[in-house]
Swiss-Prot record:
It catalyses: L-arginyl-[protein] + ATP = N(omega)-phospho-L-arginyl-[protein] + ADP + H(+). Catalyzes the specific phosphorylation of arginine residues in proteins. ATP binds at residues 15-19, 162-166, 193-198. This is Protein-arginine kinase. Its EC number is 2.7.14.1.
């Protein structure tokens, strides 16, 4: 079980994720490595991981060996893996305890990422930083005293740190405040985007808050900024909830319980409709309106109903109608237990 799925409380914040990117001194960037150079890189890095006792703690997945289905599974895990520019030579190390993931030859030579529940950016970064220090004792990174960590993508230059918070903002979304907030945050070097989309429309009310800048700020500055912004978003969402009129609250409660009834009894449902109703159900749990469910159940449902997840559990790829039926079955089983 991935750790973030089990939250500590009924938090608006679902999970925090940190990823750092590193390149090895004296080796070409990932995009221009040939096969022999990649094998040399792999031998060096895996040898290092064995020395510092990482390798035995991980499952090692090689995409070139035809294990794309396993990667599809993680693509649905709130974007644990998103970009595969070098699919043939991508190596994925998944910690057996779900504490961290390491990607070799993805965006850069090494990518280390960790996700945990709630607003826990500092704790997540601490885990990654400790692991990074162990690796750096054995491998010399590409580093410049003025520019910081050197990367093939200029957007990652500097700290080469990407921090993200996944947050549930149904009231801000329904009151059409998200677009205004997105534009304001962009001015502060922060991106706010929906993790689920249908065309140009946000779906599911789950948003990713992430840093844009990696250069000219320390790791601490980046994390502190993101935590501060997230706390402001939490406060704004709570204010929307607290300031509902009596009639608005009654309607919201009715919408929440209707959504729960539909999901517990549906036979066939598409992804967007399911995410819409699951957002209502999650809100119901957060507000204490729904007492016989946990956020763990809702989080699990949101992940398990994604197309790649359903296909991953099937022997062969299933058609759209069968996908809808299987999705409804997953939701019924998850929300009725």
């Amino acid at each position: 079980m991935v750790q973030w799925i089990s939250p500590l409380d009924n938090s608006i914040v679902i999970a925090s994720k940190v990823k750092i990117l590193r390149n090895i001194k004296g080796i070409k960037f990932t995009k221009i490595l040939n096969e022999d150079e990649f094998n040399d890189l792999l031998s060096m890095v895996l040898g290092c991981f064995k020395e510092i006792d990482i390798l035995d703690k991980c499952y090692v997945v090689k995409l070139k060996d035809g294990e794309e289905k396993i990667i599809d599974y993680y693509k649905e895990n709130f974007g644990l893996i998103k970009y595969f520019e070098n699919k043939d030579n991508l190596i994925f190390l998944m910690n057996k305890n779900g504490e961290f993931n390491i990607l070799l030859n993805e965006e850069e030579h090494i990518g280390i990422e960790c996700t945990n529940s709630g607003l826990s950016l500092r704790e997540v970064y601490s885990k990654i930083d400790n692991l990074d220090d162990l690796i750096e004792e054995k491998i010399h990174y590409s580093f410049d005293s003025e520019l910081g960590y050197l990367t093939s993508n200029i957007k990652n230059l500097g700290t080469a740190l990407r921090a993200k918070v996944f947050i549930h903002l149904p009231l801000l979304s329904s009151n059409n405040l998200i677009k205004i907030i997105k534009n304001a945050l962009k001015e502060e070097g922060i991106t706010l985007r929906s993790i689920y989309n249908s065309g140009n429309k946000d779906v599911g009310n789950i948003y990713e808050v992430s840093n844009i800048k990696t250069l000219g700020m320390s790791e601490k500055d980046i994390l502190d900024s993101l935590i501060s912004i997230t706390n402001k978003l939490i406060l704004r969402e709570k204010n929307q909830r607290d300031n509902l009129s009596k009639d608005e609250y009654i309607k919201l409660k009715d919408d929440i319980l209707r959504a729960l009834g539909i999901l517990r009894n549906t036979y066939s449902i598409d992804r967007d409709e399911a995410l819409k109703y699951l957002s209502y159900v999650r809100l119901g749990v957060e507000l204490g309106i729904i007492e016989d469910l946990t956020l763990k159940s809702v989080n699990s449902a949101m992940i398990e109903i994604q197309p790649d997840m359903i296909n991953n559990s099937s022997i062969k790829k299933i058609d759209i109608q069968s996908l809808k039926i299987e999705r409804a079955k997953i939701i019924r089983n998850t929300l009725n237990t």
